[in-house]
Curated annotation (Swiss-Prot):
Domain of life: Bacteria
GO cellular component: cytoplasm
Reaction equations catalysed: [protein]-peptidylproline (omega=180) = [protein]-peptidylproline (omega=0)
Protein's UniProt keywords contain Isomerase: yes
Species of the source: Bifidobacterium animalis subsp. lactis (strain AD011)
UniProt comment concerning the protein's domains: Consists of 3 domains; the N-terminus binds the ribosome, the middle domain has PPIase activity, while the C-terminus has intrinsic chaperone activity on its own.
Pfam families: FKBP_C, Trigger_C, Trigger_N
Keywords: Cell cycle, Cell division, Chaperone, Cytoplasm, Isomerase, Rotamase
NCBIfam families: tig (TIGR00115)
Enzyme Commission number(s) of this protein: 5.2.1.8
Descriptive protein name: Trigger factor
Cross-referenced SUPFAM superfamilies: FKBP-like (SSF54534), Triger factor/SurA peptide-binding domain-like (SSF109998), Trigger factor ribosome-binding domain (SSF102735)
Annotated InterPro entries: PPIase_dom_sf, PPIase_FKBP_dom, Trig_fac, Trigger_fac_C, Trigger_fac_C_sf, Trigger_fac_ribosome-bd_bac, Trigger_fac_ribosome-bd_sf, Trigger_fact/SurA_dom_sf
Record bears the keyword Lipid metabolism: no
Amino acid sequence: MKISVRNLEPTKAKLTITVDQDEFDPYLEDARKEIAEQITVPGFRKGHVPGKLVDQRVGFGAVAGEAVNKALPDMYAKALDEKDIRPMDQPQIEVVEMPQSAADDTKLKFTATVERRPEFELPNLEGLEIAVDKAEVSDDDVNNRLGTLRQRFATLVGVDRPAQKGDFANIDLTAQTDGETVDSQEGVSYEIGSGTMLDGLDEALEGLSAGEETTFESTLEGGDHEGEKAQVKVKVNSVKAEELPELDDDFAQEASEFDTLDELKAEIRKNIEADAEGRQATIARDAFIETLEEGLDIPLPKGVRNNMVEQQLKSMGVEAGKATSDQKKEAEEAVDKMLKDQMVLDALAEKLDVQVSQSDVFNFLGSIAQQYGMDPNMFIQALMRNGQIGSARREVARSRACSPGCVRWKFTVDGEPLDLSGFLGSEEAEAQAEEDESVAAAAAAAAVADNLTSDDGTDAE
């Protein structure tokens, strides 16, 4: 196989690949065998039709076309590996030449234009040091968390006063346009100030007592008259306020497994400290990545960036063509950081020779599927059909690259070393974690294990 590479941009390359006949012949034979299983030729059993007869029956062009479709991904992957090119998107492939008959010695020749990861050099990981803020927990933090727990055990009691923000009102609603009733609801329970129904409802309800009513103008948000202005009459049937339980030992026993309020507070503080330490580890990880990126002028692949910006805008609930300059800027900044982080972590994973097995990918995807209530088997099959397995593999590698990378870096808090092994993992902890990962997810994914090929780099990021 002959490969030539022309760099169109720092992040874009065009490969011209010429496949030797002895490399292409096996694909022709496989294509003939597959077609032989599908055709009927008198005197021959299915699957046992000679190759020459297959060529005659369906035409060499059909055989060669099937062979080319199977050969291109393999030859492209080999070319990427040989030329050390790391793609960041699906290639644009064009067949330039191919044999037109069994006797034609024309070689298969095709081009592949692809956006690639640019070349850059990571800094030396040894001896790096960074100071991280101390993970502090205040009494206010504990009281706020306790207040949230207390809120969950609140009860609603009727009140004989005008409604105010935070109250729960039982209301009847009637909407009219041009004097005609277009919608009505009765006995609706609504938290005043929540803003979950019509615009203007919160303001209309504040100050009303049970039995009182008022009318306000609003825009209807559903039904046949969605988007129309309407006069909305609201009547208050009852007003209830939240009554919070006393903070005492009885509350601690009702809300937790602890006997006293002091024990409950101690547990809350312990949990908040664990959360703070987790955030501290995340800050350390982000600082590690930022340090790797310092001084690196990494060009971003334009096509990949544009597609990601469009997806980012969609996630913000904005159509790309209708985005304001501020929204577009926000999306572009988020994508630029995301892309740069991905490329740096990919390079780090290669530098550290991070290994990712099929089981690792299965467990990773299985956990995602479970989070979204999906069947892991079906989820993985869908990713395979869309060519995204390689992306998942790289995501696992990026995550794993951070652990050994951060271990080589010294983190300090107030001048004292910070131990992040509990969050970033030691080799022993990672090995144990792998054993403890979801067996169910791996078993569910095993049905597609035979079809999962190694990452050929053609997956879109």
